[in-house]
Regions:
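C-terminal signal-anchor/stop-transfer transmembrane helix together with its immediate cytosolic
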Residues: 196-233
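Sec-exported extracytoplasmic/periplasmic mature domains
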Residues: 1-8, 39-46, 90-98, 138-139, ...
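Juxtamembrane amphipathic/hinge helix adjacent to a transmembrane helix
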Residues: 166-210
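Membrane-embedded segments
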Residues: 1-62, 71
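Switch/connector loops and helix/strand junctions flanking conserved nucleotide-binding motifs
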Residues: 22-25, 155-156, 184
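A mature extracytoplasmic/lumenal domain signature
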Residues: 16-18, 29, 40, 118, ...
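VWA/integrin I-like adhesion module and closely mimicked acidic/polar interface patches used
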Residues: 73-80, 84-92, 96-113, 117-165, ...
């Protein structure tokens, strides 16, 4: 993992979700820990893109993925509750409040960005829709960018266009596998937002309390996996 595009001191966290969420690692600037966790996830999930891939897995490979996803399926008859996953991730950030997020909360928290990876196909009844979750994050000045993680053949589906509309209408960037944009571009944009926020807060601090301001960017990566596992007995 190449951390050259991320300024040292910026904190990163990872939350995964299906019907419920699990924190893989909380906000941290321990990049050794982050690298270890992401490498482990990459090894477990590599090449798993369809039910056919799952059917071809060995029992050991299947168990590795089941272990990694443990804690994300604790509600019956519900999967992929995307809005709930976004809110759970946002709750990792200082100052975020469930239900009634406001600018008072935003003033107490650090600049933050969430990267949401999903195909936006919901099964079940979530507590928060994606739009409701984005309303809450926007109120507390958390930017949410979207990475469409479904198949290319579904990029024109209504669920995909709905996700694009929701993300972009709340100030985020929406990327698909085939739109020509890259993760590096997204990271650069996040860094640009961080630099602008630092500059603005510095100007404010020079007026209100010279020399006393501090700021760090919290970048949250949400990786969402559709769990269609069939237990092998």
């Amino acid at each position: 993992w190449n951390w050259s595009s991320i300024s040292r001191g910026q904190r990163i966290g990872l939350s995964i979700f299906n019907s419920t969420s699990r924190t893989v690692f909380p906000l941290t600037d321990d990049y050794e820990l982050v690298t270890k966790q992401l490498t482990s996830a990459s090894k477990a999930l590599k090449g798993v893109e369809s039910q056919d891939d799952i059917d071809k897995m060995s029992d050991a490979e299947y168990q590795d993925i089941a272990n990694w996803l443990e804690g994300t399926q604790n509600r019956k008859d519900a999967t992929s509750l995307i809005g709930d996953g976004v809110v759970s991730c946002a709750a990792m950030l200082p100052g975020f409040a469930y239900g009634e997020a406001n600018h008072a909360n935003a003033d107490r928290q650090r600049a933050a960005s969430i990267v949401l990876a999903t195909d936006n196909v919901v099964s079940g009844k979530p507590t928060y829709s994606l739009t409701e979750a984005l309303d809450l994050t926007q109120q507390t000045k958390i930017t949410v960018d979207g990475l469409y993680s479904g198949p290319k053949a579904s990029e024109s589906d209504q669920t995909t266009t709905d996700m694009k509309s929701a993300i972009e209408s709340h100030g985020g960037i929406f990327l698909t596998q085939s739109n020509g944009a890259s993760i590096d571009e997204l990271v650069r944009d996040i860094q640009s937002r961080r630099d602008t926020d630092v500059e603005n807060k510095a100007k404010s601090s020079m007026v209100d309390a010279p020399g006393l301001w501090t700021l760090a960017l919290a970048v949250i990566l949400i990786i969402w996996i559709v769990c269609a596992w069939r237990l092998r007995r």
